[in-house]
Amino acid sequence: MFRPPSIKDAKKIWELIGRCKPLDINSPYCYALIGRDFFDSSIVYEEEGRIKGVVIGYLRPRAPERLFVWQVAIEAKSRGKGIAKRAIEAILKNLERKGHCIQAIEATYTPSNLASKALFHALGREWKVVWIEENFLEGALLSAQEAHEEEWLITLPFSSEALGVQGANHANL
C-alpha cells in the first residue's frame, strides 16, 4: 500500500535508507521534516504494517513544475517488483490532483548506484521521453573528510505528445 509519509515514520525511513547502500543517510530529524513538509511529493510503500520502500521528492522552489526525486529506497527483498516506478507514478498523480503541473522529473545518481540510473532510464523508455544527463556535482563538494562520488543529474522532461495526454495529465502513466 502506498501512502504519504508522516513525522512518525522518520525512524523507520532512516533505518530503511541505512540498509539501502549506496544511499547517503540523513538524520531521523531530516526524515521527520520530510513527513511534515514534503508529504505531497514523497511516498512510502508499506506491507503488513512495515515500511518496505520510500521515495522522497520535492518541488523545486524556483522551478515548481519540476519534481526532484531526492531518494529512492526499496528493501532488498522487495526490489524488482516495480515498486519504485509505481511510487513515482503515484506521486505524480497526487501532485496533479493537488493542482500541480509537473513538466519534468529530476534526480541525481552516483556512478556506483546502477539501480537508480536504471530506474530513471526505464521510466524514460516507458514514457517515451528523451532524458538528459549531465555531470552535476563533483565529489569533493560533498564531503570534506571522505571520498564521495560525483553526482550526475538526470532530467526526464515530459511532453503531452510523448505521454499521449493533454497538458500535464498523467493518467496514462
Curated annotation (Swiss-Prot):
Cited Pfam families: Acetyltransf_1 (PF00583)
Family: Belongs to the acetyltransferase family. EctA subfamily.
Protein name: L-2,4-diaminobutyric acid acetyltransferase
CDD domains per the UniProt record, alphabetical: NAT_SF
Superkingdom, taxonomy of origin: Bacteria
GO MF term set: diaminobutyrate acetyltransferase activity
Domain called N-acetyltransferase: residue spans: 1-148
EC number of this enzyme: 2.3.1.178
Sorted UniProt keywords: Acyltransferase, Transferase
InterPro entries for this protein: Acyl_CoA_acyltransferase (IPR016181), Ectoine_EctA (IPR012772), GNAT_dom (IPR000182)
Chain's gene name: ectA
Metabolic or biological pathway, per its Swiss-Prot or TrEMBL entry: Amine and polyamine biosynthesis; ectoine biosynthesis; L-ectoine from L-aspartate 4-semialdehyde: step 2/3
Keyword Metal-binding among record annotations: no
GO biological process, one term: ectoine biosynthetic process
